[in-house]
Each structure stands twice: as C-alpha cells, then as structure tokens.
Swiss-Prot record:
UTP binds at S13, K191, T192, K193, P194, T195, Q196, K227. InterPro entries: Class_I_gatase-like (IPR029062), CTP_synthase (IPR004468), CTP_synthase_N (IPR017456), GATASE (IPR017926), GATase1_CTP_Synthase (IPR033828), P-loop_NTPase (IPR027417). It comes from Ralstonia pickettii (strain 12J). This is CTP synthase. GO terms for cellular component: cytosol. Catalyzes the ATP-dependent amination of UTP to CTP with either L-glutamine or ammonia as the source of nitrogen. Regulates intracellular CTP levels through interactions with the four ribonucleotide triphosphates.
C-alpha cells in the first residue's frame, strides 16, 4: 500500500517546496524505495498552458502531453519515475470533474459542497496520481500542495490531506512543512516568529507537521531550532535547517545529513537500507571543479524571469556536468537587438534561441540567428528558435525576402512557417485548428518518435530515431522545403505520417554547428544522464572557443 508525504508551505511562496519534495524523493529512492510525486495547484485554471510565463514560469510538458507545473520538471530531474498528466492537477480540474458528475446525476440529488464533495474528489485525484507510476506499486507518494497555509485557495487541499491522514490511519501519512526564517539585517538576527505563526495556522486546520523545513539564507543555530521546536510542538531533530546553496543538487545531501529521510521513514514505519547519495556527491564535486568554461547567449523576451526557461537552463548545466564545463548563461533581451546593435553577441561562445510565442522580439531573435550563421558561432534553435532560423535562412539565402510565419504576419508573401489547420487529437479524431481556435490544449503536445536521416549531425547525436516532447501550434511549411533544401538547408528529421520537419541543420561547408529542433529536448535532460543534443552543443561551443583563441594568438 502506498504511503503519503504531504509537503506544504508557509509565510511566503517560492521558498522551494518543489526542490524540497524532489530532494526528499531522491533520498528515499536512494534507499531502494519506489517513489512518485504529485503537485496540487490551487488556482482555478485547468492547467498552466495559457498562463503568462511572467505569472507562472515555465510550462513543463510530460510524455503523455500534459501541460503542467514546472515543479514536475524538478521531479523528473531528481528521480527515475516519469511524470504523467495524473501527477499534476488544479482546482479548475477538480471543480470541472465535480460539476460534470453533478450534471450526470451521480450525487443523487444531494447538495454539492466543498466538504465532502470537493475534498473527496481531491483525495480521489491524489490516489489516482499515486497509482500512475511504478504500475501502481509506489512505496511512497510525495504530494506537494501549492501556495501557502492560510491562502483561501489552498484550504480544500489541506482539508483533503487532513481527511486522508484520518482515513488511512496511523503511520500511513506524514507532513513536511516548509517555512521561512528571515534574517533581519538591522537587528542582526534570524526571526522565528513567522514560522511559529505558520505552524500554528497549520495546526488550526488539524495538521501537525512531522518535519519542519526552515528556509533561511544561512544555517539556523541550534538555539533557534530549539525555540522553533518548542512552539511547533515537535522534536528538535525534526526542525531541519535549509539554507541557500549555489546549486540545488546539494539539497539531497543537506536534508539527508540532518536526518529528514530517517524521520519520515520512522513516521511511516518503513524499513529501508541507508541512503546512498554517492551519485549526488560526485555530481556536486564535478560541478565545483570544472575543467572548462564557456558563455552561451540565450536570446529571448522572458529573460527578466529565468523561471520561464527553467528546464532549458538545467539542461545546459547538465551538459556542462557531462563535459566538465562551467556553462555561464548570458540572458539577452531580443528587443534590444532589433535596432541592429549586435555587439553584445561578440564575446559569446554559442547562441541559443529558445521556444516562445507571439511577435514581440522576433526580429531581434532573427538578427541574433543571422549573426550566428554569418560568424560561424554554434547555434541551437528550439521550437520557435528553429522556426525563426528557417525564416532567417529563407530571407537571406533562399531568395524569399519577405518570408515570415503566419503567427506574426498572416499576409506574408512567403509563409515558410504556418498553422496546421487539421490535426488528429489523442483519440484519433480529426480536429480542426485555426487562428480562432481555443488556446488551451490545442497544441501538438507530448512525445513523438521520428526517424532521423543518416549521415547528418542529427544522426550523430541521436542515432536512427529521436523521441522528444512537443509544445507548439505552428510548423515549417512543407511547401517551401524544396526551396530551402536547394539553398543548402538539411531537413534531418521528419514526422513519419505528415512528413513535417522536426530537425534542420546546415552542412559543414556552410557552418560548423547550426541545428534547429521543433521539439523541446530540455524536458528529457537529467543531471544523471545529461542529454546528447545539449552535450553536442556545449562541445561545439568549446571547439569554437578554442578556434577563436587560436586565431587570436
């Protein structure tokens, strides 16, 4: 029977509940347990697919095509289990499900209320999500509840967790509460009062934390931990100090050294071997002792909020980890390049244009792509970054001066990137798509296997087949592919049924390393295994750096 650990937060959001949950999962997995994770989001949106990156950060796409919270990316990077649609749900999905049941008459004429109907539905979703991994035989499911204790939106989720604890009985459910212990510079001391109030609020709901994770910018002294334990009504060793570190991959060791996994296993009556975190120790050692250093320019319009590119940033770090390279990322606002001033690109070892939506900043990205192509700087374009590379190539090398995407100009003379107006949905039914279609859930989503053309860079990286995740509406227009290929572009991977371009590259005679991909490879990169595409990209950046230094000598 699966046991549950609920991870809650207090005082403020963005303390790192997702990292804490993922780190605990990694420790338990290293003890030989089968672990899965769930994220419960209290907002009313059905999913984050239509939310602004400035509001929500990155949208993480699962193998089965769900648009989910970015914390699921942390989960996949820290544990071996793959997340699915069932591993993330929102208030919107809960209410949608309950209302459908009410309309079908499943409640037999009863008044539908938050308690018990909404809370029962939340519990059903939690148990369904826990069964989605390990063939339904997970030993532990770690359930992160978004928001903070005291939020109106979070109350039904916390009540559902309390009810699950009561229903399942002793030693079946544990609670880890993450809270803030701020350092007040003017007083020169850490303040525990916000944490005391947060735990008090949680206990009012009927939940007593098993462990308390106290976030601070420095280690919390024992006397402060003793004070917290007294007011929180829990043993001092269950008050865990979680301080700021330079890499999130140190967190599993930090929590393990303070006995968090021991506390949880004792509460749940789980017997398991000691944790073996040697892989994480080796990872941290490699990160702290690189042999090389490069700078990659990431050109986008969400650069002021790097959470928008969380998986991509981590994928680049993973590639650095597997090439013993410190990867520095310089974030470049694409709108600042639209005036033609590209001097900021001169010191870069490689250029990357990530995925995105909308017209704003696209001409600046195209200038960066042109710079990379003409100067021989390694280039990687992801999703929109590939589409813009096709537009740049069409304009300057294929004789289509006004080439564009219909996303930006629906009257363009050469729509080299266009909307696919007819797709098969997940059930195999024809689904019409147009510019007027709903935005939510109407993209090509999830993993797809695609054959790769032999003798290409893509084949050297991936082998005969690529299996990556997608999140996009627009595609490279097949009508223009012959003209692009005649001008020198190589389409190195195509979808088997629609024959749509999935990867493009330039031959070595035109550029040393220029690759665009329609999918999102960052979603499958992990610190343990890295990713072949990002590894090849970092190696190309190192080669470019060495050639530049050799030429300058």
């Amino acid at each position: 029977m699966t046991k549950f650990v609920f991870v809650t937060g207090g005082v403020v959001s963005s303390l790192g509940k997702g990292i804490a949950a993922a780190s605990l999962a990694a420790i338990l997995e290293s003890r030989g347990l089968k672990v899965t994770l769930l994220k419960l989001d209290p907002y009313i949106n059905v999913d984050p697919g239509t939310m602004s990156p400035f509001q929500h950060g990155e949208v993480f796409v699962t193998e089965d095509g769900a648009e989910t919270d970015l914390d699921l990316g942390h989960y996949e990077r820290f544990v071996s289990a793959k997340m699915r649609k069932a591993n993330n749900f929102t208030t919107g999905q809960i209410y949608e499900s309950v209302i459908r049941k009410e309309r079908r008459g499943e409640y037999l004429g009863k008044t539908v209320q938050v308690i018990p109907h909404i809370t029962n539905e939340i519990q059903a979703f939690i148990e369904r999500g826990a069964a989605a991994s390990h063939d339904g035989k997970a030993d532990v499911a770690i359930v992160e509840i978004g928001g903070t204790v005291g939020d109106i939106e979070s109350l039904p989720f916390l009540e559902a967790a309390r009810q699950m604890s009561l229903r399942l009985g002793r030693n079946q459910v544990a609670f880890a509460h993450l809270t803030l212990v701020p350092f007040i510079a003017s007083a020169g001391e850490l303040k525990t009062k916000p944490t005391q109030h947060s735990v008090q609020k949680l206990r009012e709901i009927g939940v007593q934390p098993t462990a308390l994770l106290c976030r601070a910018d420095r280690p919390i002294p024992d006397d402060e931990r003793a004070k917290i334990s007294l007011f929180a009504n829990m043993p001092q060793d269950a008050v865990i100090s979680v301080w700021d570190v330079d890499t999130i991959y140190k967190i599993p060791q930090m929590l393990n050294e303070q006995g968090l996994d021991r506390i949880i296993c004792e509460e749940l009556r789980i017997e398991a071997p000691p944790a073996d975190l040697s892989v994480w120790a080796h990872m941290v050692h490699t990160l702290e002792n690189p042999q090389h250093e490069i700078t990659i320019g990431m050109v986008g319009k969400y650069v002021d909020l790097t959470e928008s590119y969380k998986s991509l940033i981590e994928a680049l770090r993973h590639a650095g980890l597997h090439t013993s390279t410190r990867v520095n990322i310089e974030y470049i606002d694409s709108e600042e390049l639209e005036s033609g001033h590209t001097q900021v690109l001169d010191t870069l070892d490689a250029i990357l244009v990530p995925g995105g939506f909308g017209k704003r900043g696209t001409e600046g990205k195209i200038r960066a792509i042109q710079y990379a192509r003409e100067k021989g700087v390694p280039y990687l374009g992801i999703c929109l970054g590939m589409q813009l590379a096709v537009i740049e190539f069409a304009r300057h090398l294929a004789g289509m001066k006004d080439a564009n995407s219909t996303e930006f100009n629906d009257e363009t003379e050469h729509p080299v990137v266009a909307l696919i107006t007819e797709w098969l949905d997940r059930d195999g039914r024809v689904e019409k798509r147009s510019a007027d279609s709903d935005l939510g859930g109407t993209m090509r989503l999830g993993s797809q296997r695609v054959p790769v053309q032999s003798g290409t860079k893509a084949a050297a990286i991936y082998g005969a087949e690529v299996n990556e995740r997608h999140r996009h509406r627009y595609e490279v227009n097949n009508h223009y592919v012959p003209q692009l290929e005649k001008a020198g572009m190589i389409i190195s991977a195509r979808t088997p049924s629609e024959n749509l371009p999935e990867m493009m590259e330039l031959p070595a005679s035109m550029h040393p390393w220029f690759v665009g991909v329609q999918f999102h490879p960052e979603f499958t990169s992990t610190p343990r295994d890295g990713h072949p595409l990002f590894k090849a990209y970092v190696e190309a950046a190192l080669a470019h750096q060495q050639n530049t230094q050799r030429a300058a000598a």
